[in-house]
A protein has these predicted regions:
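ABC family nucleotide-binding domain
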Residues: 3-181, 185-192, 197, 203
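Extended, non-globular alpha-helical segments
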Residues: 160-163, 231-246
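Short, polar/charged, Gly/Pro-enriched helix-capping and turn/loop motifs at alpha-helix termini
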Residues: 183, 208, 243-246
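Conserved beta-strand-loop-alpha-helix hinge in the C-terminal portion
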Residues: 207-235
């Protein structure tokens, strides 16, 4: 998919770590407002791809375009949420959210609004050690939204929380993405999560041919466990076995 109006357009000709090639001829384009999940076996290059997409990793051959313009490094239009919340333990939740700012009145107001949006207004003055795992990840989501990004990258953000909290965070992500028309690229090992959240699912085989295989869940609205998703899940698992011999 190569269109001029893509929010994020990536072509990675090659990414190497020493003598080992982890990505070769991988091309993925994301439309504005689209939620895309990136799946694949461990070691297939998902995290490397996400690091390149964020602008953090420039040591590769290829090209990234953000809203049609070359991306040459970290950009405030791209937010990043990690598997672990990575909150500064000596700062309050509100200060963590507004960390990358002058912490002036406008920043504090925005921090308060974002914490309200993710349901943490009562914990604004708490320290990270006082939060549950789910609350800490909510704070990380608020921090990821602080710069008003148009693209949000997430690296297995819900894998460290319990199943009930995971579902609530998934619904929060969908709500925020719709309200802000965010483009979302989510790395996950959870096929059910990908099926529930995504407009498209991309199975990555970093050095394979083809390097990507695309799946499209049925249109929304759809719920967890919908019968229509079962056949697609089976197809994805079959393809995973074929690609990665797992």
């Amino acid at each position: 998919m190569r269109h001029a109006n893509l929010a994020l357009d990536l072509h990675i000709a090659e990414k190497r770590y020493g003598a080992r090639t982890v990505l070769r001829d991988v091309g993925i384009g994301l439309r504005q407002g689209e939620v895309v999940s990136l799946i694949g076996a461990s070691g297939c290059g998902k995290s490397s791809f996400l690091s390149i997409a964020s602008g953090l990793d420039r040591d590769f051959r290829g090209e990234i375009k953000l809203h049609g313009q070359p991306l040459d490094g970290v950009h405030r239009d791209i937010g990043f949420i990690f598997q672990e919340p990575r909150l500064f333990p000596w700062l309050t939740v509100a200060q963590n959210v507004a960390f990358d700012s002058d912490n002036d009145a406008a920043a504090q107001k925005l921090s308060t609004r974002l914490l309200t949006e993710v349901g943490l207004q009562e914990q604004a003055q708490s320290l990270p050690k006082q939060l549950s795992g789910g609350q800490a990840q909510r704070a990380a989501i608020a921090r990821g939204l602080f710069s008003h990004p148009r693209v949000l990258l997430l690296d297995e953000p819900f894998s460290a929380v319990d199943a009930f909290t995971r579902m609530k965070l998934q619904d929060l992500l969908l709500k925020v993405a719709r309200q802000r028309e965010l483009t979302v690229l989510l790395v996950t090992h959870d096929i059910d999560e990908a099926l529930y959240l995504s407009d498209r699912i991309i199975l990555l085989d970093g050095v394979g041919s083809p390097a990507v295989t695309e799946f499209r869940p049925p249109p929304r609205p759809r719920g967890r466990g919908d019968v229509a998703l079962a056949a697609l899940k089976s197809s994805i698992i079959d393809r995973l076995h074929a690609v990665h011999a797992i």
